Amino acid sequence: MRNPLLDRGSPAELADRGQVIDKKVELGTFARLTEAVATDLSSLATEHIPQKWRQAPVAIRLAFGWADDGRRFPTAEGRVAAHVPAVCQRCLGPLELNLDVDLKLLLAGPDQVAHATGDYELWEIDEATIRPLDILEEALIMAMPLSAMHGPGESCDTPGETVPTESADTVRPFADLRSRISGPAGDMEPDESE
């Protein structure tokens, strides 16, 4: 059975067929996104990395069609949604990003860019054929924040905000210094052991 996400075709062919892709796939299907997430998660301790995160579901709905009656401008409309693990750049702890991207794309070649019309976002195509998976993966990557952080009200302990507890084993080399300083001029009393 063919996978419409992986099959290459020209935007015009996909639009002529009225190709519709409505399915759930695993996050691991998107190689570049998975690589970026794995790199980010590598800074976490092993016990904080979510188990089986590559198997997280990604919901896809993508329909190809035409923007005009003259069939000059193929389009891709739909939505892609996924929960992607990340590292909070404030507390350096794990968090989950909710990526939900609505797509309304005009698939145009370099020679068609000047003629693009409508309320579609222009998606310039460099090759004669495309793979729907590549469009969806690029949309998810672009939806990821540059600096992922916990939202307001979420548990996020910024390093430096937490006060470390004092250990009984703490060595304080200057703790005795105050008792050795006497008088308003700050003259030091000689150590009697000398």
Residue ranges and their predicted role:
Residues 1-194:
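Structured interface patches
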